[in-house]
Amino acid sequence: MDPTLTELLHANLEWIFVGGKGGVGKTTTSCALATLFATTPISDAASPGGTRPRRVLLISTDPAHNLSDAFNQRFGPHPTPVKGLEESLAAMEVDPKNFTHGALMSSLTGTKRDGSASSLPEEAAADAAQHTTTFARIGAVLKEAARTMPGIDEISVFAEILHYVRTLSYDLLIFDTAPTGHTLRLLALPQTLNSTFDKLMSLEGLAPMIEAASHLIGSNLGDLGGACGDTAGSCEQATAAPSPSSAAPGAGSAAAASPQSRWCITADEVRSTALHWRQTMEEVQARFSDPNRTSFVCVCIAEFLSVYETERLVQELMKYNIGCDSIVVNQLVLKPSSEPPCRMCSARQKIQAKYLEQIDLLYEDFHVVKMPLLSDEVRGVPALKKFARFLQEPYSPETHGYIDVQEPC
């Protein structure tokens, strides 16, 4: 097949994952690929000339982020325009600490999600303060535990994926993934969560049990004007906003904002939330397995461990029905014949030739892109553009010769 990623460029995909063994050039490849897509317009009949810039978001899912280093620009947990490509390319680095802090502290302390203090009746302030302090301490312990919880990196990344499923404001998302083990756990998450939800919801009495637990927690927060009663109906009344004609000014907001009302959960709400999550999981899983929307680009080097891990990755992707027909082989020692012989270069070329032959045999129906080893670091948009050129044009040492990706000083 064509030894380039040109077909990928014109496939009108929504998600592209770039992954492989650690240290093989995944970040450089994903950044170059994002730059290539961002500089390639897409068809749009409503735009002047029939085309417009493609809106690309590059997301690092690796706990050890390198996007900032690759672009010579600091990125955070929110999309930030890439300098020089502000109209078409943004990047972000998912931070599990931000995810666990926001998810836990908003629900386990006495503050609202917008950060303002809860408004309570004066007579209940002391009691509420005592219980709020207790729950704040519990929240701090849980937050610290969540930060070190196995799989939290994958869960935080998956939370970002869910967010962009619901609000897809970009034409393409490119994921610079963690090394193979992390990535496989991430890709398995929809299937795992679906199975877990099915097992949990099949347990008789689970929803009423959660409802009872929420009432117990609410009652332990103190008697704040009867926000939670003994039945689901009283709980629903506490969480519902009273009508203006039947409530005194400020009374309704106090009840609605009370700790009890935040902890009251009905069995129907449990089932509704579980159903909503399952539907979202199914949507993500459907996108993962749709070759017209999602593709995976494997990155490797021509060495035994990398080739072995790439084959394992390809087999796992097939198990999850995730499309993968592109492999980028980095760091190849490719020299023009006019160059003087080099003992070290010849030794490396001999090793690489053996594994390139295996790659060609294993992946004859893949787009195998062979990228040269460069003497300079690929950093910054200009260097990434030069590197990206050979993702859509096969590199030839005789034709292209020595490649300078960095501008001379």
UniProtKB/Swiss-Prot annotation:
Keyword Transport: yes
GO molecular function, one term: metal ion binding
Disulfide bonds: none
Gene Ontology cellular component list: GET complex
Keywords: ATP-binding, Cytoplasm, Endoplasmic reticulum, Hydrolase, Metal-binding, Nucleotide-binding, Transport, Zinc
GO BP, sorted A to Z: tail-anchored membrane protein insertion into ER membrane
Catalytic residues (UniProt): 62
Binding site for ATP: 21-28, 303, 330
Principal localisation: cytoplasm
InterPro entries: Anion-transp_ATPase-like_dom (IPR025723), ATPase_ArsA/GET3 (IPR016300), ATPase_ArsA/GET3_euk (IPR027542), P-loop_NTPase (IPR027417)
Transmembrane segments: none
Top enzyme class: hydrolase
EC number: 3.6.-.-
Subcellular location: Cytoplasm; Endoplasmic reticulum
Binding site residues for Zn(2+): 342, 345
Taxonomy, superkingdom: Eukaryota
SUBUNIT field: Homodimer.
Family per similarity comment: Belongs to the arsA ATPase family.
Function, in words: ATPase required for the post-translational delivery of tail-anchored (TA) proteins to the endoplasmic reticulum. Recognizes and selectively binds the transmembrane domain of TA proteins in the cytosol. This complex then targets to the endoplasmic reticulum by membrane-bound receptors, where the tail-anchored protein is released for insertion. This process is regulated by ATP binding and hydrolysis. ATP binding drives the homodimer towards the closed dimer state, facilitating recognition of newly synthesized TA membrane proteins. ATP hydrolysis is required for insertion.
Name recorded for this polypeptide: ATPase ASNA1 homolog
Originating species: Leishmania infantum
